[in-house]
Amino acid sequence: MAHATQVGLQDATSPIMEELISFHDHALMIIFLISFLVLYALFLTLTTKLTNTNITDAQEMETVWTILPAIILVLIALPSLRILYLTDEINDPSFTIKAIGHQWYWAYEYTDYGGLIFNSYMLPPLFLEPGDLRLLEVDNRVVLPIEAPVRMMITSQDVLHSWTVPSLGLKTDAIPGRLNQTTFTATRPGVYYGQCSEICGANHSFMPIVLELIPLKIFEMGPVFTL
């Protein structure tokens, strides 16, 4: 999870997040090189006296600065399109969980376990235990298995919300009257935090998401016992 003074992205807990971090580094390297070359050209322009203000035509230069940006855009677009395809791919999920956004809490339904339904509210500061995180803890965590593909079906009961867990690389809008879906496969056990990422009213900041990822064998004993 994120911590104070953190500069980089959160540690990846799914293959999709690993791909996103790699793409971030790839794009950042290209942007850094472009910025360096532009600043270097500006520096030379300001410091050298060997400038010619009478140039009216330079076909070679125009060809270069047309083709080069196109190549750079392709180098950025191709990895981005690959990740976009991976995020939309649904690979025979082992479990399906439904998340419903409300003002201002989340409701969850384990459709594969007899329709187990529960609400997840943020814990007020008075109920926090030592070591708990302010504005991020909930009364009922979402318990899911690791190393198994999980499908999240996300919708809203009232206004626009967004179900987001950064460590898993997930951000899916919850739209009234529409059922969006996303999949992920967690690679490490632990407790992971997220929040509603779509402004949804006065208490938008009080809609945390907490996932407790556990080994598959423990999960198969029954998620109801770990809530």
UniProtKB/Swiss-Prot annotation:
Q: Which GO terms describe its molecular function?
A: copper ion binding; cytochrome-c oxidase activity
Per the record, its GO cellular-component terms are: mitochondrial inner membrane; mitochondrion; respiratory chain complex IV
| Record field: catalytic activity | 4 Fe(II)-[cytochrome c] + O2 + 8 H(+)(in) = 4 Fe(III)-[cytochrome c] + 2 H2O + 4 H(+)(out)
Domain of life of the organism encoding this protein: Eukaryota
Which residue ranges does the entry give as Mitochondrial matrix-facing topology? 46-59
Family assignment? Belongs to the cytochrome c oxidase subunit 2 family.
What are the UniProt keywords, alphabetically? Copper, Electron transport, Magnesium, Membrane, Metal-binding, Mitochondrion, Mitochondrion inner membrane, Respiratory chain, Translocase, Transmembrane, Transmembrane helix, Transport
A GO BP term here is:
ATP synthesis coupled electron transport
Q: Which residues bind Cu cation A1?
A: H161, C196, C200, M207
Q: Which cysteines are joined by disulfide bonds?
A: none
Q: Which residues lie on this side of the membrane: Mitochondrial intermembrane?
A: 1-14, 88-227
Please report a single Pfam family linked to this protein: COX2
Task: Give the Enzyme Commission number.
Answer: 7.1.1.9
Record-listed Cu cation A2 binding positions = C196, E198, C200, H204
Binding residues annotated for Mg(2+), in chain numbering? E198
**Localization terms from the record:** Mitochondrion inner membrane
Instruction: Supply the source organism for this entry.
Output: Hylobates lar (Lar gibbon)
Q: Its membrane topology, per UniProt?
A: Multi-pass membrane protein
Quaternary assembly? Component of the cytochrome c oxidase (complex IV, CIV), a multisubunit enzyme composed of 14 subunits. The complex is composed of a catalytic core of 3 subunits MT-CO1, MT-CO2 and MT-CO3, encoded in the mitochondrial DNA, and 11 supernumerary subunits COX4I, COX5A, COX5B, COX6A, COX6B, COX6C, COX7A, COX7B, COX7C, COX8 and NDUFA4, which are encoded in the nuclear genome.
Q: What are its cofactors?
A: Cu cation
Could you list the residue ranges that cross the membrane?
15-45, 60-87
Residue span of the signal peptide, if any?
Answer: none
Protein purpose: Component of the cytochrome c oxidase, the last enzyme in the mitochondrial electron transport chain which drives oxidative phosphorylation. The respiratory chain contains 3 multisubunit complexes succinate dehydrogenase (complex II, CII), ubiquinol-cytochrome c oxidoreductase (cytochrome b-c1 complex, complex III, CIII) and cytochrome c oxidase (complex IV, CIV), that cooperate to transfer electrons derived from NADH and succinate to molecular oxygen, creating an electrochemical gradient over the inner membrane that drives transmembrane transport and the ATP synthase.
Protein name, UniProt field:
Cytochrome c oxidase subunit 2
The cofactor remark states:
Binds a dinuclear copper A center per subunit.
